[in-house]
């Protein structure tokens, strides 16, 4: 199973609650550009698309998915689910358990849009070692997972963007 783990784009510092924080203009652009990169990257693989997308219920993660979906010309619209299990304080073991269910259902590729510290914990759990990736906003890591162990195939940090 190809697993793409993405941290949300740059978010506002202040909001009524952590859950309600929106992406900044910069964060929206990061997410869109990473979506374009991911679409192009998938076209070079046998995968060509994503089977399932898991998105945190937090506003900034949903806005990140929206931008990625825009980059995919809305083709991901019917493939995503909002899951409470991938909020910042979710548990990597629960995520792995759910990935096992998806793998058993025949899902070959998954995008997870979530938060620190969980994104790093998921990588560490799948990889079986300390997470070597710095998850800056909108970073995407790709892991190939066989159900027991995984290897990190690559990671893509968001490019530097100059806003006018």
From Swiss-Prot:
Its EC number is 3.1.3.-. It comes from the Bacteria. The keyword Hydrolase applies. GO terms for biological process: protein modification process. Keywords: Hydrolase, Protein phosphatase. GO terms for molecular function: protein histidine phosphatase activity. Pfam families: His_Phos_1. The keyword Hydrolase applies. One of its GO terms (cellular component) is cytoplasm. Belongs to the SixA phosphatase family. This is Phosphohistidine phosphatase SixA homolog. It comes from Haemophilus influenzae (strain ATCC 51907 / DSM 11121 / KW20 / Rd). The lineage of its organism: Bacteria, Pseudomonadati, Pseudomonadota, Gammaproteobacteria, Pasteurellales.
